[in-house]
Amino acid sequence: MKKSQYFIVFICFFVLFSVHPIAAAAADSDNSTVNEWFQKKDEKTADQSEQKKEKTTKTADETEGAAAPSVSAFDFVKMIFALLFVIVLIYGLVKLMNKRNRLLKPFQYVENIGGTSVGQNRSIQLIKVGKSVLVVGVGETIQLLKEIEDEKEIEVILSQHEEAMSSKIEWQKFVKPLKSSEHQPQQKLPSFSKALKEQLEELKQNRSEGKKKGPRHHE
């Protein structure tokens, strides 16, 4: 009887001492799993925060890159200067071509400097004949009104004519060739110059006849 009681007590002590380390181990394992779960959660939140930061930096870089192509005041000034340079270059080329065309033209002994209309089919023209400048009335007939003899006045008239010719920009040559308008003045110039020469010859004859009559009248 006593032996059975001792045996039962021994078994109880054995069970108690054997269960305690198992429970401690289980508790330790439970504590380790909880710690690992918290660590994993912290790492996950840290990764999510880093991803959010990277996204925000990317969006900021993209917005800065999109805002970069905006035109500044310096770019606007450069564009204006480039446009002015192109305009000046075109003007210089056109002026040079006009000057070259005038140099290639044959020398004209008789040249129309300019004129103005004074009525229907009537006008007053300035004609350059050699180094002389004549004021001619053109109507049904051609009459010599005046011969400009002042050298300073002649220089002023010719210089103004040259400036007007040099500053004149013939844009029509770059658009289309006006063949008809180029041929018509060439057809009219011979008849006009011929009539002018005849008028000048008649004027010379009248002057020479007047000089001859003068001495006879004195005799």
UniProtKB/Swiss-Prot annotation:
GO terms for biological process: bacterial-type flagellum organization. It is found in: Cell membrane. Keywords: Bacterial flagellum biogenesis, Cell membrane, Membrane, Signal, Transmembrane, Transmembrane helix. Its main location: membrane. It comes from the Bacteria. It is a single-pass membrane protein. It holds the Pfam family FliO. May be a structural component of the flagellum that anchors the rod to the membrane. This is Flagellar biosynthetic protein FliZ. It comes from Bacillus subtilis (strain 168).
